[in-house]
Amino acid sequence: MSRGKTIRPSYYDEEESSQDELSHTLNKGRSNIGSQSDDEEMSKISFGALNRAQTKLNKHNQKHKTQEDNYKSSEEEFFDSGSDSDGLPEETSSKDTKKKKNKHAPSESSSKRPVSRIRDIPGLPSRKQQTLHTDIRFDAAYGKADLAKARKDYAFLDEYRKQEIANMESLLKDKKSKLNDDEREEIKLQLQSLKSRMDTLKNRDLENSILSNYKKQQMESFKEGKVNKPYFLKRSDKRKILQKAKFDSMKPKQREKAMERKRKKRLGKEFRQLEFKPTNR
């Protein structure tokens, strides 16, 4: 005769039975409010069931509280942004902040937020950096500036620069002028920068005139039939012609200084070529 297997109640069975017991008692207590048997029914509930019920209630209350806080914060952001959309306010969470897959990838923005009417175009200065009154002649939106035309239009400024240089030189030579050392040094620096600017403009004008004259000669010879097609200078040929023209336009002292600089440069180049590394023996 086979014996029957004894089935022991597991921990989960006890937990389910205690939960059923707790729910049964609570439902019964709701239906029989004010009866004398409430205390007896509550005394039969185990402490484990009461503890589990308390933790469930705490979790439910905490979840409800966080949902209310998120709703309030999203409602405040909605009214602060001033959007006229009729939709519900968005819930702000950490999921909205998306990280880039690559640092060179373009930045992503939400399509639910309204785009500002004034946008910053890359390559152009922003609206915040610009002043109220701007000069459209130097605006980058109108293309690259023509330096030759600008130089021709503002050539009259050279007279003012020359007059300013003469005033500075006379002020430095005047022994009666009550200038301290700092003021003299500042005037000397301004005078030097102004002279270097004038030299740069003069050299640029010389280069433009030489190249324009050469181009005119080529076009005239082409029209007369002396050449089959006009010859445009290479960079090396252009540099040689400009150096020769600059050397011819220099004064004797300036030529000596230029020759001395060129000689030192050539010597330094030769010394660098003669240098050698000692071999390890």
UniProtKB/Swiss-Prot annotation:
TM regions (residue ranges): none
Single GO BP term: maturation of SSU-rRNA from tricistronic rRNA transcript (SSU-rRNA, 5.8S rRNA, LSU-rRNA)
Comp. bias (Polar residues): 24-36
Cell compartment(s), UniProt: Nucleus, Nucleolus
GO cellular component: 90S preribosome; nucleolus
UniProt keyword annotations, A-Z: Coiled coil, Nucleus, Ribonucleoprotein, Ribosome biogenesis, rRNA processing
Chain intervals with Basic and acidic residues compositional bias: 65-75, 245-259
Organism domain of life: Eukaryota
InterPro entries for this protein: RRP36
Disordered: region residues: 1-135, 243-281
Coiled-coil residue spans: 48-78, 161-205
One Pfam family hit: RRP36
Described function: Component of the 90S pre-ribosome involved in the maturation of rRNAs. Required for early cleavages of the pre-RNAs in the 40S ribosomal subunit maturation pathway.
PANTHER family the record matches: RIBOSOMAL RNA PROCESSING PROTEIN 36 HOMOLOG (PTHR21738:SF0)
The family this protein is said to belong to: Belongs to the RRP36 family.
Subunit structure: Associates with 90S and pre-40S pre-ribosomal particles.
Name this protein carries in UniProt: rRNA biogenesis protein RRP36
